[in-house]
């Protein structure tokens, strides 16, 4: 679209596939339709699920891609905002309709996801097709916090199938202020610690750290937690992992071969020279680490540090270098296996649709809540799905406890009842078996989605190919 708009001779943006092309074959035990695709009829020549790539399912249930398309093709678009002068410039993208006769415009200012001001913009003058107009928009901008201006376009009068006020699309503009950091992350990062020593014990394979309410156990072979217990409540079903793998998407079909040749799907963390430092009010565990897989040299090398404070905060500092010669990474992050009952998700970042570095046109910055099941995108062929980009905060909870991840540097997260290994193993969504845990991935980096099933390779700026990779994250455990 950037190319199309830059040159009047260009056209494009046409929908490649409206619906998933798949054949219904009854229903699953839980009542969902079972769909067949290429190869399911024992035919020798077929395209697999190549045509299961629509904007809607075979029974016309919208996929997230349809929401993306809707907002990409919105009727109006912000082309400039002068925050100092309070002037918002909007272009009419319609070919035949005056914008002022078609829609109304409202705005919201969001600070760290929360709405702090809202109002309507005056669209009184005619705006002919493809013309621009400048509107006055002078909200009060908070001096601190990550702030965004959300401009929403709504239908001004009823039309067939649509009612007045129907959302036609939106634009989001980042706002500048004196301190654009997420303030809750700032508060947690600077939370004062006491001066009481923490209890530390060590064996050949474990390091145990105890505060008044929190017990942490780390595996010295990985440098990662194997148990986190707060007031008697265990938060980990399985040991934590450093994670560079994802269930390949349809568009990963070519790069997947390189990923598997590099054994990314088998890569795990290994720690060397683990040290413990005890100070009043906190304990630091540091280790030289690598991400390694069988038969190949380490994919990543670097340093990992955990800091545990007497205020029950665990802080992770991860600094890694990617070994030259390896392909770009699918992702880099921390994978936690929480109890399945922890299925409520509250997050501050891009939502409510799934979002990736190159797929986020249907999302905006806000504070959202959902269940783990709500976040799953039920593609017929299971694959990576449901990530949310540019987040500073996510809380996973049940009625008894919560785990909150906070960071000043934005991260992506994914919460699912399915492991990435299960998504890879199954041919169709109705064959998936829940893991019995809530699988929480906290990612410092996540590769884009792209269009390499039949289009060009993923653009370099959307690849995880930096030599230096890092992650800073705070985990706060709470019981009720």
Regions found by a protein language model. Give the residues of each.
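Beta-strand/loop-rich accessory regions of lumenal/periplasmic or secreted enzymes
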Residues: 138-145, 159, 174-480
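Extracellular/periplasmic ectodomains of large secreted or surface enzymes and adhesion receptors
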Residues: 43-47, 57-60, 64-67, 73-77, ...
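Intrinsically disordered, low-complexity Pro/Gly/Ser/Thr-rich segments with frequent PxxP/GP/PP motifs
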Residues: 103, 108-158
